[in-house]
């Protein structure tokens, strides 16, 4: 098999250890959280891996938002933040052997008001809009909680 075919087969088999985290919020700082279907009780913002090594991060962010919530409106903003974290052992089988860390890139998606959400039943069980501090407390992921706690800073910025 040519090396490019091996690379393509490899990327089709394993998740890419680069992802986006999208904090969906209203002007009043209400934040959308969704509950994982594979881990009931685990609440998070929209997140997902790149589909291809060359997929632009904003494209991945919009794709994940649409897939996981059905939301297709709002103003996406790259917060220019990234976190490298250890992949939970329960999910490491999704990545190539030896991959233990993921780099997560944070975006904010400002929506005009609380919007209805259409969940992918395969991925999520429920959704809730919460004030930003309560949303941060409910997140199972420390990096997700930390990103939400920075929301007021990013909403206050022009642009």
Segments predicted by a language model, with ranges:
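Acidic, metal-coordinating catalytic segment for phosphate/diphosphate chemistry
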Residues: 1-26, 96-97
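Active-site-adjacent beta-strand/loop module that shapes the phosphate/pyrophosphate-binding cleft
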Residues: 83-116, 128
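Conserved Nudix-box catalytic region and its N-terminal flanking loop in Nudix hydrolases
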Residues: 26-74
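A short coil-to-beta-strand element that immediately follows conserved catalytic motifs
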Residues: 72-83
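NUDIX/MutT-family hydrolases
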Residues: 105-110, 117-149
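Short connector loops at helix/strand junctions that flank enzyme active sites
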Residues: 17, 45, 100-104
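Short, charged/polar surface micro-motifs in flexible loops or helix N-caps
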Residues: 25-30, 39-40, 52, 82-89, ...
């Amino acid at each position: 098999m040519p090396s490019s075919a091996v690379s393509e087969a490899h990327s089709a088999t394993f998740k890419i250890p680069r992802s986006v985290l999208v904090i969906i919020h209203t002007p009043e700082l209400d934040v959308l959280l969704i509950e994982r279907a594979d881990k009931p009780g685990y609440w998070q913002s929209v997140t997902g891996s790149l589909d291809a090594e060359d997929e632009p991060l904003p494209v991945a962010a919009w794709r994940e938002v649409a897939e996981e919530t059905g939301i297709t409106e709002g103003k996406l903003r790259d917060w220019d933040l990234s976190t490298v974290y250890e992949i939970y052992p329960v999910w490491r089988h999704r990545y190539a052997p030896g991959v233990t860390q993921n780099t997560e890139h944070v975006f904010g998606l400002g929506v005009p008001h609380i919007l209805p959400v259409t969940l992918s039943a395969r991925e999520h069980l429920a959704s809730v809009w919460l004030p930003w501090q309560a949303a941060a407390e409910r997140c199972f992921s420390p990096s997700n909680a930390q990103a939400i706690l920075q929301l007021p800073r990013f909403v206050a910025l022009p642009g």
